[in-house]
């Protein structure tokens, strides 16, 4: 019983981790590791071809097609061949990435959603654990034992739903704790109004200066 409850919890936890981190992020990490092990030679060839193509382009740009036509034509043929080889290598890596993405998505679905469905259906009649007698009303007891577990027990499907709810609530709590607090709003500046109030005084001072000049 305890092992089954733990297995269902771990499957639910794995599913939630995939949801939290993101499928695309996990796929990118997995493909990077896969490329490092199985596609290192092709990736090295791609880098070498890209470097050679850039060098050939630079040298071709420095060569005059009129004054050095033979050299220019040779460089042009070399550049065209390098571009063709680079495109072929890029297509190989792109095809490998597409194939890996499909296999990874299938494997991830089997390990998360598929495993949860299989466990809930295969152990649908087996109670995960029993509740104390009379601890919950009959409608709640029937709901916890849905679809085929004995009344008074918690079924595999109900246990999986409880685990998902607890993990989702835990995620919300962590996000609310780590979320930055809103910045406090400061007092509204009163600069323009004070400037307006100072204008009459300035006018009075100007008039006083004019009277002094006249005197």
UniProtKB/Swiss-Prot annotation:
UniProt record similarity statement: Belongs to the WRB/GET1 family.
Coiled-coil ranges per UniProt: 73-94
Keywords linked to the UniProt accession: Coiled coil, Endoplasmic reticulum, Membrane, Transmembrane, Transmembrane helix, Transport
InterPro entries named in the record: Get1 (IPR028945), Get1_fungi (IPR027538), Helix_hairpin_bin_sf (IPR029012)
Subunit structure: Interacts with GET3.
Highest classification ranks of the organism: Eukaryota, Fungi, Dikarya, Basidiomycota, Agaricomycotina
Function: Required for the post-translational delivery of tail-anchored (TA) proteins to the endoplasmic reticulum. Acts as a membrane receptor for soluble GET3, which recognizes and selectively binds the transmembrane domain of TA proteins in the cytosol.
PANTHER family: GUIDED ENTRY OF TAIL-ANCHORED PROTEINS FACTOR 1 (PTHR42650:SF1), TAIL-ANCHORED PROTEIN INSERTION RECEPTOR WRB (PTHR42650)
Molecular function terms from GO: protein-membrane adaptor activity
Any one annotated GO CC term: endoplasmic reticulum membrane
Cytoplasmic face of the membrane: 25-108, 171-215
Chain's gene name: GET1
Protein name, UniProt field: Protein GET1
